[in-house]
Design a protein with these regions (language model features):
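N-terminal beta1-alpha1 ligand-phosphate binding loop
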Residues: 2-34
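Glycine-rich phosphate/pyrophosphate-binding loop and the adjoining helix
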Residues: 2-3, 135-180
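A general structural signal for well-ordered alpha-helical segments in protein cores
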Residues: 7, 20-24, 62, 90, ...
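Short hydrophobic segments within beta-strands
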Residues: 10-12, 40, 111
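Short, glycine/serine-rich, charged loops/turns that create anion-binding
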Residues: 14-15, 44, 115
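N-terminal glycine-rich anion-binding loop in soluble enzyme alpha/beta folds
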Residues: 28-47
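N-terminal beta-loop-helix "entrance" segment that forms/cooperates
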Residues: 42-59, 151-152
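Helix-loop-strand module that forms the ligand-binding subsite of alpha/beta enzymes
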Residues: 57-133
Length: 180
């Protein structure tokens, strides 16, 4: 019997040093014992989405993604904005999840790490997830205002305001999963 709820953390960035990934790694370190955060690291391994490839067997990277998402109690997503939208690699990940029978109803919480907003991408992401029948846990993404590219997990953890913002997100997850 699992004691902790499993939350799969999905970063929408492929950058080696990503503020979105840093925020998720900081959340991982700050998580209470009632949450087990898992960091998905296969974004760059996914093949381009092709409906013709959605057959048994699925490409191995896609099967691993779907298994990780299906076994998670919730998703925590931090995604950057690129050209006023969701980056292509992350949209590709979402496209592979559309056909997953276990995705509809999946609880999802969004983090917004952009100091300048990234509202276009956040709105597009919420629209995509709503279309996929995700259960968005908050009307708006939880703001964790980081300075941008090159922000490390250490910098996040050393900033009391950013840690407090991440704690808000973690509390939302705990409360939502307790009620789920």
């Amino acid at each position: 019997m699992r004691v902790a709820a499993q939350v799969l953390c999905l970063s929408g960035s492929l950058r080696r040093v990503s503020s979105n990934t840093a925020a998720l790694e900081a959340a991982y370190r700050l998580a209470p014992s009632t949450l087990e955060l898992l960091l998905y690291k296969g974004l760059g391994e996914l093949p381009l989405f092709n409906p013709d490839a959605e057959t048994d067997p699925l490409p191995s990277a896609v099967a691993e993604l779907r298994e990780a998402v299906d076994s998670a109690d919730a998703l925590l997503i931090a995604c950057p904005e690129y050209a006023h939208g969701v980056p292509g690699a992350f949209k590709n990940l979402l496209d592979w999840l559309v056909g997953s029978p276990d995705f509809p109803g999946k609880p999802v919480l969004l983090l917004n790490t952009a100091a300048r907003g990234s509202y276009h991408a956040q709105e597009a992401l919420a629209e995509i997830l709503t279309t996929m029948s995700a259960q968005l846990l908050a009307a708006r993404p939880v703001m964790v205002a980081l300075p941008g590219a090159g922000c490390s997990v250490t910098q996040v953890l050393e900033n009391a305001d950013r840690c407090a913002e991440l704690q808000v997100a973690l509390r939302l997850l705990v409360e939502a999963l307790a009620a789920h």
